[in-house]
Amino acid sequence: MNYFALFDLPRKFNIDKKLLSQNFYKLQLKFHPDLFINDSESKKKIILEKSIQINKGYKTLKNFLNRAIYFLCLNGYEVKKETLLLKNNDFLIRYFSLYEQLDNLKENNFNKKELNNLEQIIQKKIIYCKKKIELEFEKTRYKKVIKIISELLFFEKIKDVLKKEYNIYLRQIN
């Protein structure tokens, strides 16, 4: 199933998110399982499967990273999030210092200035990666996109770790 076709969108990475949402709601109205409650079991099963497919497609296309991986898949590239970073050692070595900064933050009881600085660095890297991915998709440089996705995954992960560690710290002091 091609999710771009399902939602009547052009098959390109950058999508009209408003149109995606509009078409999602139209499909949900047409294929919502509650509308077929009096139909046969086989029809209900088909409708339920279609509804699941619609929801999965919507979640895939709505999320930047999932859409990127899906679009690569449509273009013949199999991408597994779990192993991407392992293939980008140079990048890991270069940016592992962000984890050291996170450790320093924890040791300094999440100094507000240092925390804001690290958050800004990470957010700028995430924005840069997303713009670079969009650009490389336009140029159909899929192998470069894969490399940048691994970098984006790293920055997203450290952002999540920072948030989690900061929340743990806040619970401890309260």
From Swiss-Prot:
Keywords: Chaperone. Residues 2-74 form the J domain. PROSITE patterns: DNAJ_2 (PS50076). Pfam families: HSCB_C. GO terms for biological process: [2Fe-2S] cluster assembly; protein complex oligomerization; protein folding. The keyword Chaperone applies. Interacts with HscA and stimulates its ATPase activity. Interacts with IscU. Belongs to the HscB family. Co-chaperone involved in the maturation of iron-sulfur cluster-containing proteins. Seems to help targeting proteins to be folded toward HscA. This is Co-chaperone protein HscB. It comes from Buchnera aphidicola subsp. Acyrthosiphon pisum (strain 5A).
